[in-house]
């Protein structure tokens, strides 16, 4: 795997996307444009539609109505360019670390797998079993497994939620660093608002199946923990999440 910039990322366009489960409307005519290479965090209350949006983009669900596009192409037609990470690293315990990274690949993939492991700081653990790794190291392997496919779109479903505080900060820095290096588009679903504003270019609040807040994070990188501006943005998002009767309020865009 070339360590140079891999691609320009996948541009996303959702036009009036709805998702229903019987009478339950999870996404309701949602419109969204994400430019290629943007890092977007999605927050909101449980059941608001965050994970459903991610599953639609991953091709694990199909919309009830509307279009999900990569530019002008249906995203489903280029699904191989999309990779997803979960809270559970989902490593196969009977395969070595490097074999987990190269899972499903054919041909001469070992060099690329070693480079992907080097990118996440684990090339020296390539021959070990997953059971020997910590939770954070397992997530690094899962990240390497995504990187080897040179994704245009990386979907992150609470991938750091089970990690301790220090490991979580280290993984945040690693993900942002690799995003800056390789240029893929990122969509991160998280319940941690501080994580959202620390990592993303843009924070979306999804509530009752629609976008209730679209906030630009206008803070230069690298971002300093404890900065006043980060705290202000975090407080604004938290206040919005906690509001009641929000379904009648218009979308607010900043930046």
UniProtKB/Swiss-Prot annotation:
Q: Name one GO molecular function term.
A: ATP hydrolysis activity
GO cellular component term of the entry, any? plasma membrane
The compartments listed are:
Cell inner membrane
The record, for PROSITE patterns, names: ABC_TRANSPORTER_1, ABC_TRANSPORTER_2, SSUB
User: Cross-referenced CDD domains, in alphabetical order?
Assistant: ABC_NrtD_SsuB_transporters (cd03293)
- Which Enzyme Commission number(s) are on file for it? 7.6.2.14
Residue intervals of the ABC transporter domain: 12-233
Bilayer topology reads: Peripheral membrane protein
Keyword hit for Disulfide bond: no
Instruction: Tell me the InterPro entries matching this sequence.
Output: AAA+_ATPase, ABC_transporter-like_ATP-bd, ABC_transporter-like_CS, ABC_transporter_ATP-bind, P-loop_NTPase
Transmembrane segment boundaries: none
Q: What is its biological role? A: Part of the ABC transporter complex SsuABC involved in aliphatic sulfonates import. Responsible for energy coupling to the transport system.
Oligomeric state and interaction partners are given as:
The complex is composed of two ATP-binding proteins (SsuB), two transmembrane proteins (SsuC) and a solute-binding protein (SsuA).
Full protein name: Aliphatic sulfonates import ATP-binding protein SsuB
């Amino acid at each position: 795997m070339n360590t140079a910039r891999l691609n320009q990322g996948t541009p996303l366009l959702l036009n009036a996307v709805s998702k229903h489960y019987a009478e339950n409307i999870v996404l309701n005519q949602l419109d969204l444009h994400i430019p290629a290479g943007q890092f977007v965090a999605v927050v909101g209350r449980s059941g608001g539609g965050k994970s459903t949006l991610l599953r639609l983009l991953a091709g694990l669900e199909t919309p009830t109505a509307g279009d999900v596009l990569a530019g002008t192409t249906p995203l489903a037609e280029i699904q191989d360019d999309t990779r997803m990470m979960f809270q559970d690293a989902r490593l196969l315990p009977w395969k070595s670390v490097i074999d987990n990274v190269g899972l499903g690949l054919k041909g001469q993939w070992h060099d690329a797998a070693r480079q992907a492991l080097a990118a996440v700081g684990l090339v020296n653990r390539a021959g070990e079993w997953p059971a020997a790794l910590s939770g954070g190291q397992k997530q690094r392997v899962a990240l390497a497994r995504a990187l080897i496919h040179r994704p245009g779109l990386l979907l992150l479903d609470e991938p750091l939620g089970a990690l301790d505080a220090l490991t979580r900060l280290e993984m945040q820095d690693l993900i942002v660093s690799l995003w800056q290096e390789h240029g893929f588009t990122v969509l991160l679903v998280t319940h941690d608002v501080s994580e959202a504003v620390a990592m993303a270019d843009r924070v979306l609040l999804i509530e009752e199946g629609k976008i209730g807040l679209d906030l630009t994070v206008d803070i230069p990188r690298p971002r300093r923990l404890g900065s006043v501006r980060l705290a202000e943005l975090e407080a604004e998002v938290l206040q919005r999440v906690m509001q009641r009767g929000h379904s009648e309020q218009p979308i607010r865009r900043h930046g």
